[in-house]
Amino acid sequence: MILVTGATGFLGAEVAKELVLRGNTIRCTKRASSKFPAILQPYAAQIDWVIADLMNEDSLIDALDGVTQVYNCAAFVSLKAADKEPMIRTNVKGTATLVDLCNDRGIRMVHTSSVAAVGEAPAGEQITEKHHLDPTTETDGYAISKLESEMEVWRGIAEGLDAVIVNPTIIIGASAGTAGSGQIFDTVRNGLKYYTRGTIGFVDVQDVAKCMIALMETDISGERYIINGGNRAYKQLFEEIANCMHVKAPAKLAKPWMMEVAWRGAAFWGMLTGSAPAIDKTSARAASVTRNFDNSKIKKAIGFEFRPVSDTIKEICQSA
C-alpha cells in the first residue's frame, strides 16, 4: 500500500493523481476539516481516504497499517508572524513522528522539503544540493521549519531510514487556482504595475510529482534533489504571464527600498485585519535577489527532462 500525506494540498493531490493514473490503489491522509481536492474527485474509487494528522501519532499508526511507501507532502504554511513558532513546531514534530514510525516499520519515504531549506551559492554560481541554509542567520519561519524538518529525515536516515528528499523550487500549475503560486498569476491578471530584479526557479507541479515517483522506484537513499524546471527573472515571468493573459505587463522597477515599505505596510494591515499579509519581509527581500538553481543532479539520477516553464505558464493562463 502507498500512503500520501498532505493529499488535499496542491502537490500532494498531484502526487496522488499521478499514482492512480499509473494503476495504483492508494491511501491518502486528510484532516477532518479538509476538503477533497477537485482533481481527485474522478478517482474516488482508487483512493482510501483516512483522517490523520502528523501531530497525532495514533492516527498515523492506523494510516500506516500495511503501507510500504510514503510520500510526505504534508506541511503547515503561513505568512502570519503569529504562526511562525506553531508552524515550525508542527512541521518539525510531525515529520519526526512520521520518520520514526516509517523507520520502525521499514517503510520507504520520499520527503518533500523546499529550496527554502537550501543555502546560497557564491555570486555567479548556481545553487546545488551541496549548499546548506545557515540556521544561525535565517529568520524566515517557513525556511526554518523546512530545514529542521529535513534534518529530522537526515536523522532518520542515519538511524536506518530508507528515504530521499526533494527540494522543489516554486511549484506552479493550473490546479493551484488563486492560492499559493496561483496568486502570482492572479496578481498579474488584476494589473501588476511593478517588477523586481530578482530571479528564482519554477517547476511544473506534474514534474515534481513524476520526479518523486521516479525516485521512489529507484534504490537511491540518503540523497536530496533540487527539483527545478527553469530559472526565471521576475520581470520575464510577469511579461510572459501578461502576454498570455492579454493584459499590460508591469513596467516599473520596484527598488529594494520600495519592497521594504511594501512588506511593512502589509504587516501593519495584516495586524489590523487579522489576515495573512500579502507579502512578508523574507519574500519582499528575496524578490530582488538572484537565485539560480542547478537541476542536473535529478536529471542525471532518473534521466528526467523537465517541461518548459513557458509551456506551464501558457496552460495556467488558458485555464484561468
Put a short name on every predicted segment:
Residues 148, 179-180, 196-216, 223:
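Substrate-positioning beta->alpha
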Residues 2-22:
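N-terminal Rossmann NAD(P)H-binding glycine-rich loop of SDR-like oxidoreductase domains
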Residues 79, 115-125, 171-177:
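Conserved catalytic-site region of short-chain dehydrogenase/reductase
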Residues 160-165, 169-202:
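NAD(P)-dependent short-chain dehydrogenase/reductase
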Residues 47-93, 101:
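NAD(P)H-binding glycine-rich loop region in Rossmannoid oxidoreductase-like domains
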Residues 211-279, 295, 300, 309-318:
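Mid/C-terminal beta-alpha module of Rossmann-like enzyme folds, strongest
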